[in-house]
UniProtKB/Swiss-Prot annotation:
PANTHER family, per the entry: HYDROXYLAMINE REDUCTASE
Residues carrying Cysteine persulfide: C403
GO MF annotation terms: 4 iron, 4 sulfur cluster binding; hydroxylamine reductase activity; metal ion binding; peroxidase activity
Taxon lineage: Bacteria, Pseudomonadati, Pseudomonadota, Alphaproteobacteria, Rhodospirillales
Protein name, as recorded: Hydroxylamine reductase
Cofactor: [4Fe-4S] cluster; hybrid [4Fe-2O-2S] cluster
Species per Swiss-Prot/TrEMBL record: Rhodospirillum rubrum (strain ATCC 11170 / ATH 1.1.1 / DSM 467 / LMG 4362 / NCIMB 8255 / S1)
Top-level enzyme category: oxidoreductase
EC number from the UniProt entry: 1.7.99.1
Cytoplasm keyword on record: yes
Residues involved in [4Fe-4S] cluster binding: C3, C6, C15, C21
Any single GO CC term annotated in Swiss-Prot or TrEMBL for this entry: cytoplasm
Gene assigned in the entry: hcp
Family designation: Belongs to the HCP family.
Length: 549
């Protein structure tokens, strides 16, 4: 095992015996092999596309495979084994399709190598052995940390892109260019000798395609559920039966809301599902009552205390405790051997569990958080914002968002939010919002000082707002009174970062620690070209932003 794809990786280097996320060496090896299997599929899919043959079912499988390997998505070796065996069958079908397509065009098929040729072992232990041979550790030995790190920066950007593309596809939105790029990247990683400049070029292209994906998902979410509207959200509970929904998938929540109409079961969001309350087609359900708990890393205590079942959608699942594992349900790609997997969005077992559970005995304390500041909501008050900036009432915008996590160093983001002067407006998104939303920031020029823009993918909203303000002021985005302070944890944050770099956004602060896979020479390139910097102390960073007391 050698895994360094998330921010909390052991010793800031790599997890080598068990993941700090909780995944075992067995699961890590199967995930490494699933990446290799996806590369093998892409080797054929890439060439078939060059012949004018697109295969949406292969696109979907490869994107799902990549999403499966994102941090805290799948801990289930049995599910991973199923995916691997399906990948081998699909690869054989693709080989036959490719050979037939070449024959029909009277051309000779290329002789492929590497992942295109892998054969699944007959046992799970054999698959694990094959996966271990595909470990990052072997590439580090063969080609060194710099080239390996660039390859993995690209791979992790594509993993996050795949996650967002999967969410969009669930809501009926796809884009051919996304799958085409993914197949190109995986084919390159499978076949082409590592070259730093070529890899860096693909990394930057990954950012450009990531913008396409973020736009795609924004259109998918708003097309299905309307444009988010500023909405007060109860941060607590009321008496009654209850289901808690965590993760990111809005369609899972929408279907559950419809299936629980009139049953006397209240639905609560957790973690990054908080922004769901701003969507008109979701908040119309009166039994979408409020938000319970905070960010993903607090789930083991918060789920244990919740008096009903929990539905985990997409990623951010942790190994459950005995206190709630019999109440934990999963759907979609998220998988854990100790949770009950639901298929086809049939939530009847989940609902039955809620009806059998005690629920909340009484109402809790009443506190509200204002969510729903998507780009259309913010741009709807753009004239007020522009006037406030020109009048000097707003001195700076500070985006504090991204992922949250366990480390005590993440208190930096709390402290930064609490130390900002009253003429600074805070934009937030992702589960990093839970580091700032407990601060009472009041208003400025008749507007809330804290604008919650949504989930991590709603970095797209921040981009749209920044572009619109830059146009209104007649300047570039980098000339705006705007500072970006991003907390990262997993691969979707890498995707968002690359999207920002593709727009030419400079001077992004990243923390609490820099990625282990970005070596000093690679970091120097990012610093020289984009001004990326690690977070410092709050006092130092406020001074650099021109916000010192």
């Amino acid at each position: 095992m050698y895994c360094y794809q998330c921010e909390q990786t052991a010793q800031g280097v790599a997890c080598v015996t068990v993941g700090l996320c909780g995944k075992t060496a067995e699961v890590a090896a199967l995930q490494d092999l699933l990446i290799e299997a996806a590369k093998g599929l892409s080797q054929y899919a890439y060439r078939l596309r060059q012949l004018g043959i697109a295969l949406p079912e292969i696109d979907a499988f490869v994107l799902d495979a990549l999403f499966t390997t994102v941090t805290n998505v799948s801990f289930d070796p049995a599910r991973l084994e199923e995916q691997l065996r399906e990948a081998a069958c699909l690869r054989d079908q693709l080989r036959a399709r490719y050979d037939a397509a070449c024959a029909a065009r009277h051309t000779s098929p290329e002789t492929l190598s590497g992942p295109a040729l892998w054969q699944p072992a007959s046992t799970r232990a054999g698959l694990v052995g094959t996966g271990e041979a595909a470990s990052i550790a072997h590439r580090l030995t063969a080609q060194g940390a710099d080239l390996t790190g660039l390859q993995d920066l690209l791979l992790y950007g594509v993993k996050g892109m795949a996650a967002y593309a999967c969410h969009a596809r669930i809501l009926g939105q796809t884009d051919e260019s996304v799958a085409a790029f993914v197949h190109e990247v995986l084919t390159t990683l499978a076949e082409v000798p590592a070259d730093a400049e070529a890899l860096l070029g693909l990394v930057l292209r990954c950012g450009t395609v990531s913008l396409t994906v973020l736009d795609l998902l924004d259109r998918a979410n708003t097309g299905a559920y309307g444009d988010p509207q500023p909405t007060p959200v109860l941060m607590g509970h009321r008496a009654g039966k209850a289901i808690l929904v965590s993760g990111h998938d809005l369609k899972d929540l929408a279907v559950l809301l419809e299936q629980t109409v009139g049953l006397g079961v209240d639905i609560y969001t957790h973690g990054e599902m908080l922004p769901a309350h701003g969507y008109p087609e979701l908040k119309k359900y009166p039994h979408l009552v409020g938000h319970y708990g905070g960010a993903w890393q607090r789930q083991r205590s918060e789920f244990a205390a919740f008096p009903g079942p929990i539905l985990m959608t997409t990623n951010c699942i942790q190994n459950p405790t005995a206190a709630y594992r019999d109440r934990l349900f999963t759907c979609g790609l998220v998988a854990h051997p100790e949770a009950t997997a639901l298929s086809g969005r049939n939530f009847a077992p989940l609902i039955a569990s809620a009806l059998a559970a005690p629920g909340f005995a009484e109402d809790g304390p009443v506190r509200h958080h204002l969510a729903g500041f998507g780009h259309k909501a913010v741009l709807g008050v753009a004239p007020q914002i522009i006037d406030a900036v020109k009048a000097g009432a707003i001195r700076r915008f500070v985006l504090i968002g991204g992922c949250d996590g366990h480390e005590s160093a993440r208190s930096y983001f709390d402290d930064l939010a609490g130390s900002l002067p009253q003429d600074a407006v805070v934009l937030t998104l992702g589960c990093g919002k839970f580091r700032v939303i407990d601060h009472d920031m009041g208003t400025i020029a008749g507007l809330p000082r804290l604008l919650d823009m949504g989930q991590c993918n709603d970095a797209y909203s921040a981009i749209k707002v920044a572009q619109a303000l830059a146009e209104a002021f007649g300047v570039g985005v980098n000339d705006l009174p705007l500072s970006l302070v991003l907390s990262w944890f997993e691969q979707k944050a890498v995707t968002v970062l690359l999207a920002l770099l593709a727009l030419g956004v400079r001077n992004i602060r990243l923390g609490p620690n820099l990625p282990a896979f970005i070596t000093p020479p690679v970091l120097k390139v990012l610093v020289d070209r984009f001004g990326i910097m690690p977070v410092g102390t709050v006092a130092e960073d406020l001074a650099a932003m021109g916000l010192a007391a």
